[in-house]
Swiss-Prot record, chains A, B:
It comes from Synechocystis sp. (strain ATCC 27184 / PCC 6803 / Kazusa). The gene is frp. The lineage of its organism: Bacteria, Bacillati, Cyanobacteriota, Cyanophyceae, Synechococcales. This is Fluorescence recovery protein. Gene3D superfamilies: 6.10.140.1840. Changing residue 50 to F: About 75% conversion of OCP-R to OCP-O. Destabilizes orange carotenoid protein-R form (OCP-R), the FRP-OCP interaction accelerates the OCP-R to OCP-O conversion. Increases fluorescence recovery following non-photochemical quenching (NPQ) by OCP, most probably by destabilizing OCP-R binding to the phycobilisome core. It comes from the Bacteria. The keyword DNA repair does not apply.
Length: 109, 109
């Protein structure tokens, strides 16, 4: 993965980034849980149960890999979360302007 | 797997065996679906969602391997189904007595 060349991270930025990270993670899990419960309650065919199983397998794999909090990649993770609506642009204002711009630009790719 | 040495299978036995097989399979799937729906509706923690995922993975694997309808193994499969309560002894009366006895004996192992 490309390294970002933004300004060094302050301690406040790092702490707030981790807090927002956890928030997005919780939102994702809450959403997944709601989706699974809604889908499970509507299943009548076994094929749909296996489809739900496939969906869960894929999501678990995706979520396991997604929340990488190494500082070298966190800009990319936030861009992805912004793209997916798990983080809102207004929540990124604790970051220096160059980081916010970079995240927004990446999210549009 | 051991071969069974019971009397040859009549056409009627084979047909009824396959019908009972499908019935047991449907019972298993119905039971699994009910279990998953009940569990899913009670989940509040993500760990429990992953546990449900693990449970489904194991069940899918088990069910995929279990309903082996080759005549050489069907006695063993019925023994397993009997043991698990997916087939009742009274449902096996279409089979010659030696086959019923063998299934019941294997189910007690």
């Amino acid at each position: 993965m490309l390294q970002t060349a933004e300004a060094p991270w302050s301690q406040a930025e790092t702490q707030s980034a981790h807090a927002l990270f956890r928030k997005a993670y919780q939102r994702e899990l809450d959403g997944l849980l709601a989706t699974v419960q809604a889908q499970a309650s509507q299943i009548t065919q076994i094929d749909d149960l296996w489809k739900l199983h496939d969906f869960l397998s894929a999501k678990r794999h995706e979520i396991d890999g997604k929340y990488d909090d190494r500082q070298s990649v966190i800009i990319f993770v936030f861009a992805q979360l912004l793209k997916e609506g798990l983080v809102q642009a207004e929540e990124l204002t604790f970051l220096a302007a160059d980081k916010q711009s970079k995240i927004k630009a990446l999210a549009r790719l």
